[in-house]
């Protein structure tokens, strides 16, 4: 007999974390047995989601996208580290505004280095919300790579400097070094391991070649060209038309040098339009300003659809087995939601077990037919209760509880008055 309800939402951007959404929905369901599994698609909010499901938060002081120190977190459990690029190198880490030509992914590399030094055997890298278009150069430098110009000088931060790239030396990756200058802090969810402050160039005891890397991303853009990292995403990071051309040239140079010095990477052709083949042309290479390319080419990462991989990490299939209903959602259910974002991934996973799915959202702009084709039988929007979007953003919690009560009435009447056997727990 089907028993519990699985609550598996993504965040409501700018209002509530995924865990907060799940808690509000659970409260609105009353005595219905629930299991809360906050989810994410690999973008911002990924660390929060996996911490809510039992991973330990590790907080570290690292280098922000413009060089300022920032406190960023990753999540760890049983030799697996989940690193979210937006934590260290995201747009929200730009207090002085965009820096499209000079922003760096160095801090993300420092998070990875810290995780490896503290025992991570697998690193899941969530890409999304990045401030930089540096092709992952900063991340590689933080991990010990040397990116040199023709005079043997280390390149400064940022995508513009890549135009002068002559050599990429990753020999340190196999030498058991995990570089970094980060400083570790205590965490409310648990301490990392009691080693205190991690200054300088630490030693992981093994090379990065011994670490498995997975890129969790739903972005399918290549590195270069009209659908590449610079053309599509750098304008969102403050790049004007001239900046886009500079960044495209830098990424093309990175791909060319990588192809020349690391033959398996691929090659670049110039025939009026820059075309990348090999790794640079793979779907996802353009994710997060080209960090996807660096992970594929130099860390030998695998790319996995973000929501699918994270649902596996959180053992969603096991938790949804025997459920009466799954409630998913995100801030806006729109056309983007139909292209592989978290609610669709949750719906697809639930469908394998024959469990119906409904969604909560702040607002929606897709039809009932589109929802049903995506595996979601019904959607409940905050704007159904409060047409003022600003009020919905400011006070979403009580509205979510009211939506959950409607869901209980519409779909869960056999549970009326029953005791919450799952105790509102999290996965």
For the regions a protein language model found, what residue spans apply to each?
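N-terminal loops that bind phosphate or other acidic moieties
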Residues: 1-185, 189-427
């Amino acid at each position: 007999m089907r028993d519990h309800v699985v609550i598996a939402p993504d965040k409501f951007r700018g209002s509530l974390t995924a865990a907060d959404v799940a808690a509000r929905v659970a409260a609105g369901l009353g005595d219905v047995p629930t299991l809360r599994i906050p989810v994410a698609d690999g973008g911002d909010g990924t660390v929060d989601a996996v911490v809510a499901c039992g991973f330990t938060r590790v907080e570290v002081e690292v280098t922000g996208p413009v060089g300022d120190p920032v406190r960023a977190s990753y999540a760890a459990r049983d030799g697996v580290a989940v690193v979210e690029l937006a934590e260290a190198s995201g747009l929200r880490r730009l207090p002085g505004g965009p820096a499209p030509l000079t922003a760096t992914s160095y801090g993300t590399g420092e998070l990875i280095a810290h995780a490896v030094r503290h025992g991570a055997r697998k690193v899941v890298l969530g890409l999304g919300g990045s401030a930089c278009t540096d092709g992952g150069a900063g991340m590689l430098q933080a991990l010990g790579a040397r990116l040199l110009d023709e005079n043997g000088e280390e390149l400064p931060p940022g995508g513009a400097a890549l135009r002068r790239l002559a050599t990429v030396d990753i020999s340190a990756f196999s030498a058991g070094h995990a570089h970094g200058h980060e400083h570790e802090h205590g965490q409310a969810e648990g301490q990392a391991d009691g080693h205190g402050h991690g200054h300088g160039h630490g030693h992981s005891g093994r090379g990065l070649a011994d670490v498995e890397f997975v890129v969790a991303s739903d972005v399918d853009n290549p590195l270069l060209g009209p659908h590449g990292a610079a053309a599509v995403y750098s304008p969102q990071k403050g790049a004007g038309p001239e900046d886009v051309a500079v960044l495209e040239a830098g990424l093309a140079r990175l791909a060319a040098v990588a192809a020349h010095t690391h033959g398996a990477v691929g090659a670049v052709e110039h025939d009026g339009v820059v075309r990348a083949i090999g790794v640079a042309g793979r779907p996802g290479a353009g994710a997060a300003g080209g960090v996807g390319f660096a992970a594929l080419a130099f860390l030998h990462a695998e790319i996995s659809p973000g929501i699918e991989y994270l649902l596996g990490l959180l053992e969603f299939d096991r938790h949804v087995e025997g459920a009466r209903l799954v409630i998913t959602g995100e801030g806006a259910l729109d056309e983007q939601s139909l292209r592989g974002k978290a609610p669709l991934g949750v719906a697809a996973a639930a469908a394998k077990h024959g469990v119906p799915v409904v969604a909560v959202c702040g607002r929606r702009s897709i039809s009932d037919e589109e929802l049903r084709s995506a595996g979601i039988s019904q959607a409940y929007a905050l704007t159904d209760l409060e047409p003022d979007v600003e009020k919905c953003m400011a006070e979403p919690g009580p509205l979510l509880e009211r939506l959950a009560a409607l869901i209980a009435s519409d779909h869960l009447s056999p549970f009326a008055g029953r005791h919450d056997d799952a105790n509102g727990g999290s996965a």
